From Swiss-Prot:
Keywords: Coiled coil, Cytoplasm, Cytoskeleton, Dynein, Membrane, Microtubule
Name this polypeptide is given: Dynactin subunit 2
Coiled coil, from the record: 241-319, 397-430
Annotated stretches, region: Disordered: 1-51, 201-228
Quaternary context: Subunit of dynactin, a multiprotein complex associated with dynein.
Membrane topology label: Peripheral membrane protein
UniProt keyword Nucleus present: no
Subcellular location per the Swiss-Prot or TrEMBL entry: Cytoplasm, Cytoskeleton; Membrane
InterPro entries referenced in this protein's UniProt entry, alphabetically: Dynamitin (IPR028133)
Gene Ontology biological-process entries: mitotic cell cycle; mitotic spindle organization
Domain of life where this protein originates: Eukaryota
Feature: compositional bias, Polar residues: 32-44
Length: 430
């Protein structure tokens, strides 16, 4: 379409500038809309961790780690292997009554205490492995320091059991006694209620017999008993607490642990920290695994390399003996030269005394030269100050002259204005 026909086509439409070219708006492609929708959905999702990862730091973190797949079964069988127990009492998580992460359920003090013991124990063992390998958890944070801090935490948890008020709540052994005391009190209360019930039943039977006796006269009497009607049953509620049975199981397991610790000390375990038997068995298995044929071949290759190095050391010893003979000759030559220097050494004290006498002269000359240099510096400073002062005086003279001229001009202007004002006043008065 030609440009001449264009204004006629849009002449009657509102809000249209006919002087500009036609422009057509097209919708964006659907891909950008979908991308925006995806981005908005990803931004709303709070479970995604958007922290940037640094490859160097992650490499340092997993550099000394090894993958252990001993307990994994890659066969096609459905049968699940029974996982052996590793560690002591605190490692078996099923022993403790640890609640799931649910807001409706609240942990008891005993459950919280046991959970903290378990978490601190497991975390300390992880840090002990890192400390044995000599690694670092993070930058400038060693595993040994963390193990010491975790040991302090365990001591603080153990000190809680020493408090007499907290022992019935936190100690499993004391808790069994606490529950037994509660049961004894409840049983005594039940017996007292049964006795009171029997007494009430007897009293009610006697009152009924008295009311049923016939009267000798023909007159009828209405007898009303003022005693209150008592119920003929006793309600006794029994509450079963699962913590008692669990505490008894824990007490049995603790007794077994103590017996095992005594056996370990009797067999010659001299370490202060009690190491569980499963851990020692795993260490023995690791030592026995060194007797494999593949590892023995590796050891043979290492022995061959060591023998080659020993032979190279023998060759180096022979070369070192030759070097020692040459060194002995050099030492003899040095000894002869030192004997010659002994004669010169006898004259050294006289030379030293002469140097001491010359030292005072040199020091006086140095001090005099320093004074002269200071005087020269002061003279230069004074000359520079005089030059700067003269330049400033010249500038002051120039500025005074310019200021006088401006003042004179201002005075003349003021006088002229005053004269004009006086003339105007005279004219107005006339």
């Amino acid at each position: 379409m030609s440009e001449g026909n264009q204004p006629k086509r849009v002449l009657g439409l509102p809000d249209v500038d006919p002087s500009q070219q036609d422009t057509f708006e097209t919708p964006d492609p659907p891909e950008s809309i979908s991308n925006l929708a995806d981005e908005s959905s990803e931004l709303v999702n709070e479970s995604i961790d958007r922290s940037s990862l640094k490859p160097a730091k992650s490499h340092l973190k997993f550099a000394n780690r090894k993958f252990n797949n001993d307990n994994e079964d890659f066969s096609d069988s459905i049968y699940k292997k029974s996982v052996p127990r590793t560690g002591g009492l605190l490692k078996n998580q099923t022993v403790f009554d640890i609640l799931p992460s649910d807001e409706s359920k609240v942990e008891t003090p005993l459950q919280k205490f046991q959970r903290l013991q378990y978490e601190v124990m497991s975390f300390r063992e992880e840090m002990q492995v890192i400390a044995d390998n000599g690694g670092e958890v993070e930058k400038d944070i060693k595993g040994v320091d963390l193990t010491h801090q975790l040991a302090d935490l365990q001591n603080q948890l153990s000190h809680l059991l020493e408090n007499e008020k907290l022992q019935p709540i936190l100690d499993e052994n004391k808790q069994v006694i606490h529950y037994s005391q509660i049961q004894n009190n409840s049983s005594k209360k039940l017996i007292s209620e049964i006795e009171s019930f029997t007494q009430q039943s007897l009293s009610s039977s006697t009152t009924e017999q008295n009311t049923q006796q016939p009267s000798n006269n023909n007159t009828t009497t209405n007898i009303t008993s003022s005693s209150s009607i008592t119920p003929n049953h006793v309600t006794y509620e029994l509450f079963y607490t699962g913590e008692q049975s669990k505490s008894q199981q824990l007490q049995r397991i603790q007794d077994l642990e103590k017996r095992l610790a005594k056996l370990e000390t009797a067999t010659g375990n001299k370490t202060t920290d009690s190491v569980p038997i499963t851990q020692s068995i795993l260490e023995i298995k690791e030592k026995l695994s060194l007797l494999d044929t593949t590892k023995i071949d590796v050891l043979q290759q290492k022995m061959k390399t060591v023998s080659k190095e020993m032979e190279s050391l023998k060759i180096q010893d022979e070369t070192s003996t030759k070097a020692l003979t040459t060194n002995e000759k050099k030492i003899n030559d040095i000894f002869e030269t030192m004997n010659k220097w002994d004669i010169v050494g006898q004259q050294v004290p006289a030379i030293i005394n002469r140097l001491y006498t010359l030292r005072s002269l040199h020091e006086e000359g140095i001090s005099f030269s320093n004074h002269v240099s200071n005087l020269e510096k002061q003279q230069n400073d004074i000359t520079s100050l005089l030059i700067s002062n003269s330049s400033l005086m010249n500038k002051m003279d120039d500025s005074f002259k310019s200021n006088l001229l401006t003042i004179k001009s201002n005075i003349q202007q003021l006088e002229s204005r005053i004269e004009t004002l006086q003339n105007r006043q005279q004219q107005q008065q006339q």
